[in-house]
Structures are given as C-alpha cells and as structure tokens.
Amino acid sequence: MEKFAPEFHGEDANNRATKFLESIKGKFTSPKDPKKKDSIISVNSIDIEVTKESPITSNSTIINPTNETDDTAGNKPNYQRKPLVSFKEDPTPSDNPFSKLYKETIETFDNNEEESSYSYEEINDQTNDNITARLDRIDEKLSEILGMLHTLVVASAGPTSARDGIRDAMIGLREEMIEKIRTEALMTNDRLEAMARLRNEESEKMAKDTSDEVSLNPTSEKLNNLLEGNDSDNDLSLEDF
C-alpha cells in the first residue's frame, strides 16, 4: 500500500510553514549593503526581507545609474534615451509630393458625366458592342486607378516586399471588380434582349388583330347568357369553371 506524506491543518500547518521559512531565510539573502535600504513586506503574517534596488524613473526618458564611487548626485552622468521612431514635420503644400498626384486624380474623374451615366442611345441600343465599349472604358478607368495607386506606393518610403504585396493585392482586386462588372453587364444585356423580344411579340399580335370585335371564351359566354336571359336553367355550377 502506498504511503502518503502526513497532512497538517489549522494552526499546526501555519506554525510548521513559519518555521520552514525562517530556516531558509538566511540561505537566499545577500550581505547587506550600507548604501541600500531594506524594506519589510508582510505576507500572511510572515516577514520577508526585500532589498530595495536603485530607482529608475518610469515617467521620464532619463536614466540615472547608481555610481558607488561617487556619493554626490551632481557627478552622476545622465543618459538621454533616443526615441525609437522619429517623425518629420509635414511639408508645405508646395513641397507636398502627393499634390501633383491629387491634382491628376481630380482631373481624371472630373467632368465625365457622359461616360458615367447612360444616354438615351445607350439605353435603346441592344447590341453587344455597346456593352463591350462600356467595359473597355471601365477597364481603362480601373487601370488608371491602379497606376496612381502604384505611383503612391512607390513614392512612399516602405520596404520592397510591402510595395510588392500592395501591388499584387490591388491587381487581384482590379481583376475581381472587372469580372463582377462584366457579369452584371451581361445580365443586364440578357434582360434587355428579353424585354425586346416581348415588345416585338406584342407588336406582332397588335399588327395581326385589326378587327374591333371581342371574342368570349366559353365561360364568359355562359355568364353573358345568364345575365341576358335571367333563366334558372342557365345557372352555373362549379364544373363549368
């Protein structure tokens, strides 16, 4: 049968723990330094000595290391910590490298109302050439956007891998946008063709029907006879419908 260590509870366990800490307290403490102050921290009624180290300012960037040879604070060297990141002041509008790019962007997308909205001829034109022409213009605009974004990325100070990653992501986004626009345009073209066929069928029916007479189906004739004759023998049943 296995043997287990004895268990202690209550006051007996507290006394044994206190004796154990007092027995090992001298093994881990270093010789006292007259220049360092000692503080006592009480943890669960057990006194443990903690050596107070030299202070380091936490809210300042200046570190004052302790010099054991000099006792005066005036002779202690001050080390200025260098900032991890340095920022330059914003350039003036005339020196801004992106001002020309911004101007070209505004000029590219300004005053393009004819290309950005459907005209009357484009709405009534059912040919595939119209859709293809619009897709070509969309592709051209997206290519210009990609070129300007690429220029902006190259102008910025970044690693080569980051620039390549952004360029690849923008190319993938461009291809995805073109595919979505192409699919939507083809669906629109199919709808327009279906509407044109229905319109042609209605026009053919109207052209063939030149008489002013209106023909009634069998159910309508029975209803008409019932209203005109007022005869009980002409009552309708559910089977008539």
From Swiss-Prot:
Changing L101A: Complete loss of interaction with protein M2-1. Almost complete loss of viral transcription and loss of localization of protein M2-1 in inclusion bodies. Residues 39-57 are annotated as: Important for viral particle assembly. Residues 232-241 are annotated as: Binding to the N-RNA complex. GO terms for molecular function: RNA-directed RNA polymerase activity. It is found in: Virion; Host cytoplasm. The record marks T108 as: Interaction with protein M2-1. Residues 120-160 are annotated as: Oligomerization and binding to RNA-directed RNA polymerase L. Residues 90-110 are annotated as: Binding to protein M2-1. Residues 201-211 have a biased composition (Basic and acidic residues). Changing F87A: Almost complete loss of viral transcription. Complete loss of interaction with host phosphatase PP1. It holds the Pfam family Pneumo_phosprot. Residues 1-30 are annotated as: Binding to monomeric RNA-free nucleoprotein. Residues 81-87 are annotated as: Binding to host phosphatase PP1. InterPro entries: Pprotein_pneumovir. The modification Phosphoserine is found at S116, S117, S119, S232, S237. Changing D233A: Complete loss of interaction with the N-RNA complex. Residues 216-232 are annotated as: Binding to RNA-directed RNA polymerase L. GO terms for cellular component: host cell cytoplasm; virion component. Residues 58-67, 213-223 have a biased composition (Polar residues). Residues 58-78, 201-241 are annotated as: Disordered. Residues 230-241 have a biased composition (Acidic residues). The N-terminus is important for viral particle assembly. The oligomerization region is central. The C-terminus part contains binding regions for the RNA-directed RNA polymerase L and the nucleoprotein. Homotetramer. Interacts with protein M2-1; the interaction between the two tetramers is required for the anti-termination and elongation transcriptional activities of protein M2-1. Interacts with host phosphatase PP1; this interaction recruits PP1 to the inclusion bodies. Formation of a complex PP1/M2-1/P allows P to target host PP1 phosphatase to the M2-1 substrate. Interacts (via C-terminus) with the nucleoprotein N (via N-terminus); the phosphorylated phosphoprotein P binds to N-RNA complex. Interacts (via N-terminus) with the monomeric RNA-free nucleoprotein N. Plays critical roles in regulating RNA replication and transcription through its interactions with multiple proteins. Tethers the RNA-directed RNA polymerase L to the nucleoprotein-RNA complex. Recruits the M2-1 protein, a processivity factor that is required for efficient transcription of viral RNA. Acts as a chaperone for neo-synthesized nucleoprotein by forming an N-P complex that preserves N in a monomeric and RNA-free state and prevents the association of nascent N with host cell RNAs. Recruits the host phosphatase PP1 to inclusion bodies to regulate viral transcription. Belongs to the pneumoviridae phosphoprotein P family. This is Phosphoprotein. The lineage of its organism: Viruses, Riboviria, Orthornavirae, Negarnaviricota, Haploviricotina.
